[in-house]
Amino acid sequence: FLRSPAGVRDAAKTGVLHRQAVEVLEMIGDPDRCTVMLVTIPEETPVNEMIETSFAIEEELGVHLGPAVVNSVLPDLDDLDHELATLAAESSLDLTDNERTALTTAAGFRAGRLRLQREQLDRLGAVLPLDQIRLPHRFGSSIGPGEIAELATVLTSAIEALPEEGDE
């Protein structure tokens, strides 16, 4: 899509189409008029795709990149194994061995997902020195007006917290 103006400019050597293509190329190359914000999720393949796309957009097209938006970020749950064990021991619940095993397995799975997520977020930050706007994972099968409002609030706060251009 962003390569189209260059194709039109090269195909139409003169005339209105050529002038308009040149104007579009000037616009998308001007960071005051055009900034691209790419969105990913904190998993290996999507992060790889964002990195590749970012370099292509900047190097090949000269388009300025804005902050990276990372969608569906799981909340950190430090010490989840200990918390589950403590809660199980302190509560009046009479858990079976199978239930304790299931809780331990679930905690291990969640801890592994969080570790992978942190690795990808760290890698993204190391390879692409862009600010990151992180949107929380929404648990559930649908998103309604309430969830959209919550995400909008998080997004607005994150944008307001970004450093001003030149303050970095």
Which residues are covered by each model-predicted region?
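Conserved catalytic-core segment of NTP-binding enzymes
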Residues: 1-127
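A general secondary-structure junction signal
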Residues: 70-72, 136-139
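C-terminal accessory extensions appended to soluble enzyme cores
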Residues: 134, 142-168
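Phosphate-binding and hydrolysis-coupling loops of NTP-dependent motor/remodeling domains
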Residues: 130
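Long, low-complexity intrinsically disordered regions enriched in Ser/Thr/Asp/Glu with frequent Gly/Pro
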Residues: 119-122, 133, 140
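Short, surface-exposed acidic/glycine-rich loop or hinge patches that mediate macromolecular interfaces
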Residues: 41-44, 138, 142
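Structural signal for conserved beta-strand scaffold positions within catalytic alpha/beta enzyme cores
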Residues: 38, 134-136
